[in-house]
């Protein structure tokens, strides 16, 4: 596989991670661990406000020679993210807030996430992806 021809053929769901191009919302190593959404073909970023989260950024690589930024995204796991806005509750769902955090999902959204615990003091939510 060459850079510029990224494919996900053959990746089994048990792998729980895959490589993606990174959009301009992701700027460096400090974004590792933040929730990401699909923003274009084979591309992830922080997504628009309310976008479905597919996982978290597991790695960051600036391939200067190829002029692309790439990262690994993990999606089969438990994670803790900072949230904004209304406090989620256990059993609710979250979506992207467009700035590298999550927020309480509206009706019918964020169904691939399940809130397990909420720390309202530190604005941190524990979720599992399903």
Locations of regions flagged by a protein language model:
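Surface-exposed, low-hydrophobicity beta-strand/loop segments enriched in small/polar/acidic residues
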Residues: 1-130
């Amino acid at each position: 596989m060459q850079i510029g021809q990224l494919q996900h053929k053959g990746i089994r769901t048990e792998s729980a991670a895959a490589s993606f191009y990174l959009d301009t919302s992701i700027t460096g190593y400090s974004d590792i661990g933040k929730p990401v959404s699909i923003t274009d073909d084979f591309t992830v970023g922080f997504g628009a406000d309310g976008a479905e989260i597919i996982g978290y950024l597991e790695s960051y690589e600036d391939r200067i020679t190829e002029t692309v930024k790439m990262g690994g995204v993990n999606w089969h796991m438990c994670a803790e993210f900072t949230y904004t806005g209304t406090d989620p509750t256990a059993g609710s769902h979250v979506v992207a807030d467009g700035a590298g955090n999550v927020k309480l999902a509206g009706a019918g959204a964020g169904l691939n996430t399940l809130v397990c615990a909420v720390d309202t003091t530190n604005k941190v939510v524990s979720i599992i992806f399903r």
